[in-house]
Amino acid sequence: MKLHDLRPAEGAHRKRKRIGRGHGSGKGKTGGKGMMGQKARSGPGPYRTFEGGQNRLVKRMPFKRGFVNKFRVEYEVVNVGSLVDWPVDLEVTPETLLARRLVRRKRMPVKILGDGELTQPLVIKAHKFSASARQKIEAAGGKAIDLTWVVERHSRSRGPNPSMRNARQS
């Protein structure tokens, strides 16, 4: 095979459509746009959810509105009532809760809620406590210790790395 034998694939080079060059061309007058109307006009056309003036589906379904907060933190929830049989000498931590299968996911922060009764004094370490849970824990003679939960948030800036800012000023 030589260089002059090479040919593009069949149908790879398509001729440009010449619109509005008389009805003999097949694309004269309306240029393939059909008769008059909103879709025949130039420009971007109606918005995606437009239904011709009828109340659109997005508006008819109120639960589909709003936005999703990407910074929202979801918690693994444990009620105080589920800690009734907990041994007094064992601290309640996210790791021990995971080992006893009271929480499912390791990578989520733990919140203690105040549903149920607590009788024994427990030392509970969690990332968040409801007011009623904290009150019940302290009323039973235990301690509610807050743990910090660090969320790694990436910068939305596409500019230079902020940590390199001082390095470039030489």
From Swiss-Prot:
Transmembrane segments: none
Basic and acidic residues composition-biased segments: 1-12
Keywords, ordered alphabetically: Ribonucleoprotein, Ribosomal protein, RNA-binding, rRNA-binding
Example GO biological process: translation
Biased composition (Basic residues): 13-26
Cellular component annotations (GO), alphabetically ordered: cytosolic large ribosomal subunit
Superkingdom as given in the UniProt entry: Bacteria
Region (Disordered): 1-52
InterPro entries in alphabetical order: Ribosomal_uL15 (IPR030878), Ribosomal_uL15/eL18 (IPR021131), Ribosomal_uL15/eL18_sf (IPR036227), Ribosomal_uL15_bac-type (IPR005749), Ribosomal_uL15_CS (IPR001196)
Gene Ontology terms, MF aspect: rRNA binding; structural constituent of ribosome
Gene3D superfamilies per UniProt: 3.100.10.10
Entries under Pfam families matching the protein: Ribosomal_L27A
Function: Binds to the 23S rRNA.
Family, as annotated: Belongs to the universal ribosomal protein uL15 family.
Subunit-level organization: Part of the 50S ribosomal subunit.
Name of the protein: Large ribosomal subunit protein uL15
